[in-house]
Every structure is written in structure tokens, then in C-alpha cells.
């Protein structure tokens, strides 16, 4: 009887134990390379902030290692930054912004004006890691801090 109770208890535990799901990351569609975009929306207290300009720099290329996509620094900055441990880091964005003169400006993105709706659009982008820097602030506002964003992620 004791063995039977232990067996029933073990079966109940296995049935109640939640299954573990493993999800693979979505593989970027190579056909979209060169056809991606970044839209930056400037809003303060729920209202669009127009004016000012943004510049976009490509700081990383997408590469694959052990089946995982990652960002590797562009050639212009490989001597200063060998890898991107945390591509979402504010500190990394600040460091890259301080190296702005070395960074390749994205074609047609050296000075994109922020429109009346508070948006700036960077289009026809290749896969990679990008640094967004505000060159001029909207009248009455300060510049936003530089930030990093990945395409297509």
C-alpha cells in the first residue's frame, strides 16, 4: 500500500508540474535587409515635440556565433570597442557618442528633422546596431541622450 501511495503521489506531482516551453528567437528575413526603418517619436507630457534634428550612425554589424545573432563593432571603432556586451546600455551609447567623428553616418541620415507630429524616420536600413544622436534640440527643450537600437530586433 505504501508503494502504491508513493507511486500515485509521484504521478500527481508530474501531472501538476508545469511543462517548460523553450522558444527559439525569430530568424530575421534576409529579404528585409536594406528595407528596415527606425521611427523616433518625440513626446513630452503626451504632446508631440517638433523641431530639432537627429543623426543616425551605424555602429555594429549583425554576425552569427554558435547559432545566435549578435552585434559586432564596425571597422571604424574595433580598436576602441572589441565587442558589445550590453547593446542596450546607456553607458555604451554615451561612449559611442563621444567617438562620433569616427562613426559612419548612415546615408541620408546626417540630419533628419523632427516633423510636426514629433517623428523622425530613418528608412532603407540594413541589419545592424545603430546610434541615434540628437544634433539640435527642439526650441524650448534640451537634447535627448544618445541611445542604441538594433535592426531588425
Residue spans of the language-model regions?
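Solvent-exposed loop/turn and edge beta-strand elements of beta-rich ligand-binding domains
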Residues: 1-153
Amino acid at each position: 500500500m505504501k508503494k502504491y501511495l508513493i507511486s500515485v503521489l509521484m504521478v500527481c506531482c508530474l501531472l501538476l508540474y508545469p511543462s517548460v516551453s523553450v522558444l527559439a528567437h525569430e530568424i530575421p528575413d534576409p529579404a528585409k535587409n536594406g528595407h528596415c526603418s527606425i521611427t523616433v517619436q518625440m513626446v513630452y507630457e503626451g504632446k508631440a515635440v517638433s523641431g530639432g534634428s537627429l543623426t543616425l550612425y551605424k555602429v555594429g554589424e549583425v554576425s552569427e556565433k554558435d547559432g545566435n545573432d549578435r552585434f559586432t563593432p564596425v571597422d571604424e571603432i574595433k580598436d576602441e570597442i572589441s565587442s558589445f556586451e550590453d547593446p542596450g546600455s546607456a553607458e555604451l551609447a554615451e561612449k559611442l557618442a563621444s567617438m562620433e567623428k569616427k562613426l559612419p553616418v548612415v546615408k541620408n541620415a546626417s540630419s533628419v528633422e523632427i516633423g510636426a507630429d514629433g517623428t523622425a524616420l530613418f528608412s532603407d536600413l540594413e541589419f545592424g546596431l545603430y546610434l541615434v544622436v540628437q544634433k539640435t534640440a527642439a526650441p524650448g527643450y534640451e537634447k535627448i541622450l544618445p541611445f542604441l537600437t538594433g535592426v531588425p530586433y
